[in-house]
Each structure stands twice: as structure tokens, then as C-alpha cells.
Design a protein with these regions (language model features):
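Asp-based, Mg2+/Mn2+-dependent phosphohydrolase catalytic module
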Residues: 1-11, 105, 121-227
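Residue-identity detector for threonine
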Residues: 33, 66-68, 79, 118, ...
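Conserved phosphate-coupling serine/threonine residues in phosphotransfer and NTP-handling enzymes
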Residues: 18, 118-120
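N-terminal helical cap/lid subdomain that shapes the substrate entry/recognition surface
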Residues: 2-110
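Residue-level marker of regulatory loop/turn positions in helix-turn-helix DNA-binding domains and
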Residues: 96, 117, 149
């Protein structure tokens, strides 16, 4: 399969913001958790607005985000917050971004090996996928924050290439955050940015992502594929 004219033998996907519509419920879930702990809600709206304006570079995991929102919290308090937040997420899981399941099914039917690379922990990822009707066995490898190396470490994708031994220049990573771009660059893997995670086009352009490699959402890949 060729994407943008280049031979691709492996597609690696982020999860939140690429497959799952985290924007559809993140604000609500954060607010519910903040209310439980008596924390300010104003910083949540400001944080999301800053991301949408491209002012904030986020790392894509709950612990770092909690530190950013409420820097006065101790490590123990952050742990409490994250644990409760994950309970809230599990009660109110994120839905699929329109077209994401269809493109995954298309790639599977075409025989394209796929992998996941996310900064979720595995236990969180598994119930996220289950709630969305996605079988983890569809993916040849999965990298989470439980791995020795995770985004943006240069060796993040090593377990994926151990499972699917293709040249790195024939792999493609699709992500929704600047940290995903960093990871792809460090690993020597081609990158496509999607805007469905809330980071604006101009932020990716500022990072150096090619304009035609920035898409609204994952299923736009169909428009640049050649079988």
C-alpha cells in the first residue's frame, strides 16, 4: 500500500484523539473529578482553550496534565486524582471518532499490519478499547506507559518493530499531539497529524509537519491511499 506515494508496510496509531473522541467527554470528566476533590474548575476551561489555540504543548497522560492544571497538588494527591479520574472515565467512556473504526477495518481487510502507541496504561487502554468495540488482537503490538520506553522516547516503537520487522521508513504513525510528532521524528518514522484531538493545524505547522500531512481525522487517510 502507498500513502502519499510512499510504500507503507505498517501503520501505528495513537488512541485518544485519533481513534477515540476524547474531546467529546474530557472536559466533563475532568470537571466531575475536580468537583469531587474541591479543585478549581476555571483552569480546565483555560487549559482546553490554550490547547485549541496552540499555546500549550501537552504530553498526553493524565498525571502530567493534572500537575499542569493544579501544580500545588502533592504526588500523593495527584495519584488520588488520577485514580478517581480513571473511574469517572470508565463510567463515561469516550466514543469513536466518526470513521475511525471503518478505516481500521479497511486496513485489516487489506492485510496491513497495525500497532498502537499510547501513553495510557494498559489497564486503562483495554477498557477504553472494549467500550469502543475494538479488539486488541487486531494489533500486532501495543506500546503503553507500562513499557520501559514510552512517548516521546526514541525507543518507544522498538517493541512494535520487533513484532513487525519492517524498515522504519516504511512505517507510518498517526497522532494528534505534538508529542506524537516528537516520537515519530526520534524514531525515524513518517508522521501524519490529525486535528481530532484538539491541537490546531497551525501548531503542527509550527512544529514542522508538512501541510498535506495534517488531516481532520483518521479516515481521511483513505483519500491518499493507493492499494
Amino acid at each position: 500500500m502507498r500513502i502519499f506515494g510512499s510504500l507503507v508496510e505498517l501503520v501505528i496509531l495513537d488512541v485518544d484523539g485519533v481513534i477515540l473522541d476524547i474531546l467529546g467527554g474530557l472536559h466533563k470528566n475532568l470537571e466531575e473529578t475536580a468537583v469531587h476533590f474541591g479543585l478549581s474548575l476555571d483552569v480546565i476551561a483555560q487549559n482546553i482553550a490554550d490547547i485549541a489555540l496552540g499555546k500549550l504543548r501537552i504530553r498526553g497522560n493524565a498525571r502530567d496534565s493534572t500537575h499542569t492544571l493544579w501544580p500545588h497538588l502533592s504526588e500523593a494527591e495527584v495519584t488520588e486524582f488520577v485514580d478517581f479520574f480513571e473511574e469517572v472515565e470508565r463510567r463515561s467512556p469516550y466514543g469513536l471518532i466518526p470513521g475511525s473504526l471503518e478505516i481500521i477495518s479497511f486496513l485489516r481487510d487489506a492485510g496491513m499490519p497495525m500497532a498502537l502507541a499510547t501513553n495510557n496504561h494498559m489497564k486503562s487502554l483495554l477498557w477504553r478499547l472494549e467500550a469502543a468495540g475494538i479488539d486488541p488482537s487486531w494489533f500486532a503490538a501495543i506500546v503503553t506507559k507500562d513499557n520501559r520506553y514510552f512517548k516521546p522516547h526514541p525507543q518507544t516503537f522498538d517493541p512494535i518493530f520487533a513484532a513487525v520487522p519492517v524498515p522504519r521508513d516504511r512505517a507510518l504513525y498517526v497522532g494528534d499531539l505534538q508529542i506524537d510528532w516528537d516520537t515519530a521524528c526520534e524514531a525515524g518514522v513518517s508522521f501524519i497529524a490529525v486535528l481530532s484531538g484538539g491541537v490546531p493545524r497551525r501548531a503542527f505547522l509550527h512544529e514542522g509537519v508538512q501541510a498535506d500531512h495534517i488531516m481532520n481525522r483518521l479516515n481521511n487517510l483513505l483519500e491518499c491511499m493507493e492499494l
